[in-house]
UniProtKB/Swiss-Prot annotation:
Source organism phylogeny: Eukaryota, Fungi, Dikarya, Ascomycota, Taphrinomycotina
Stated name of the protein: Uncharacterized protein C12B10.10
GO-annotated cellular components: cell division site; medial cortical node; mitotic actomyosin contractile ring; mitotic actomyosin contractile ring, intermediate layer
GO biological process per UniProt: mitotic cytokinesis, division site positioning
Source organism, top-level taxon: Eukaryota
One Pfam family recorded for the sequence: Nod1
Length: 419
């Protein structure tokens, strides 16, 4: 069953509203329909993969249906996660701007862009207060719409698989729909911060909180989380085959009405720009992954390079054996050195078992090595982060001491002049 929805506004209250307020109420109720539907989904895996034209039509049709009549008796419980998520993106990107403009308007995009979110990585409360001050200037209905939007994001975040690339692409996707097209890259960090701090900024009360997601995305594997190379390769392969890997050039025209066909290029552009800072017509994924290794958008401190590499281990290969090879030896009596077939088969079985055990030990060693390397990388990052924080605090203390010494000297000088 879907999460319970609030009762639709009664006709008497609708008559007291202005037409625009009634439109806002409908749009907010439509968002709450998505919120209720996502809350019962176990996961949203593969929703960021490419989708066919038929699936796109289904997404657009569903978003239009909800926008036109959000109070209809349409259950979203049975809608596949992929279609539901795509419909949600189209609803926010196309349906809401058609009726009420973008949720985050251009003037507020510029103000959100001016905040240095990396500077508040260790003290998000101060940043949250700045965001609250900006949102206090929103209209009541736009603020409610934004609150429900990030409430949905809070529900979706813990249901991602946890892969770094998937989180970046997810943040890029929602950045591409919540604001005008020309500000997709500019507000990426703002959207990421709001997605992680939404409960504090908008005073949301429902679980879960994705604070652990912040550490996974920003700082790398922790607490035994092990991102293995084969998992990355599988995701790279699926990403290379997706429609997001082909970017379409487009003009940033704020007056142009949104088009449902440009959702995928928007997501890809945001994903591409979020890592490199520039737009390109073709996305080279291998280059992207190299950039990810050297520059982490979410981490406040650059990743430290590891200073050691464990040597690779050989994996034994079991080859077939010629049972009759002893007869080829230049012996006067070959039968003196032959063993019975039963003994040979028993020894050969032991050999195969030993090879299998060695392969298992090698595999276990490989996994342990990856775990150690991940822990070493995490430890190095933590040390670098601590040293940076310590250096900043020491500089602040020195500046404060200089300021106090200066005040003391000025006070002494005034005393001497007065006497």
């Amino acid at each position: 069953m879907e999460k319970p929805l609030p009762n639709p506004p009664i006709q008497e209250s609708l008559r007291k509203q202005s037409p625009q307020d009634a439109v806002y109420d409908d749009l907010v109720f439509g968002l709450k329909r998505y919120e209720a539907a996502f809350s019962i989904k176990d996961s949203i895996e593969d929703v960021l993969a490419n989708f066919s034209k038929d699936e796109e039509k289904e997404m657009v049709c569903l978003s239009t249906s909800i926008a036109e009549n959000p109070y209809q008796s349409l259950s979203l419980e049975s809608v596949p996660s992929k279609i539901l998520f795509g419909s949600f993106l189209f609803y926010v990107k196309d349906r809401i701007p058609e009726k009420a403009g973008y949720i985050i308007e251009e003037q507020f995009c510029k103000r959100l862009q001016q905040i240095d979110y990396d500077a508040y990585s260790f003290s998000p409360k101060e940043c949250n207060e700045k965001l609250k001050n900006i949102f206090s200037e929103f209209s009541q209905m736009k603020l409610k719409m934004l609150s429900v939007f990030f409430s949905i994001v809070q529900i979706l975040l813990p249901k991602l698989s946890g892969d770094y690339q998937e989180h970046v692409q997810f943040f890029a996707s929602i950045s591409a729909v919540v604001a005008p097209r020309g500000y997709v890259f500019e507000i990426y960090h703002a959207v990421e911060h709001l997605s992680l701090e939404a409960r504090e900024v908008f005073q949301l009360h429902h679980p879960p909180s994705p604070k652990q997601t912040r550490r996974v995305v920003s700082e790398g594997p922790l607490n035994g989380v092990n991102y293995k190379q084969n998992t990355t390769n599988n995701r790279v392969s699926s990403f290379q085959n997706s429609q997001y890997s082909t970017l379409n050039n487009f003009q940033n025209n704020s007056n142009q009405s949104p088009n449902s066909n440009d959702l995928q290029p928007l997501q890809a552009e945001a994903f591409h720009s979020a890592h490199n800072g520039y737009s390109s017509s073709t996305l080279n994924l291998n280059s992207e992954l190299n950039v990810m290794k050297d520059h982490d958008l979410q981490a406040p401190i650059p990743r430290a390079l590891k200073q050691h590499k464990l040597p690779p281990i050989p994996v034994p290969e079991v080859q077939t054996t010629n049972i009759g090879y002893q007869t080829d030896l230049p012996l006067q009596n070959p039968n003196d050195n032959l063993v019975s077939l039963a003994i040979y088969e028993a020894l050969y079985e032991k050999f195969l078992k030993a090879c299998k055990d060695l392969e298992e030990v090698s595999k276990s060693y490989e996994e342990s090595r990856e775990e150690i390397e991940a822990l070493h990388e995490t430890f190095t990052e933590e040390v670098t982060s601590f040293q940076s924080t310590k250096r900043l605090k020491e500089e602040k203390i020195i500046q404060e001491k200089s300021r106090v010494d200066k005040m003391i000297d000025e006070y002494r000088q005034k005393l001497s002049e007065s006497t």
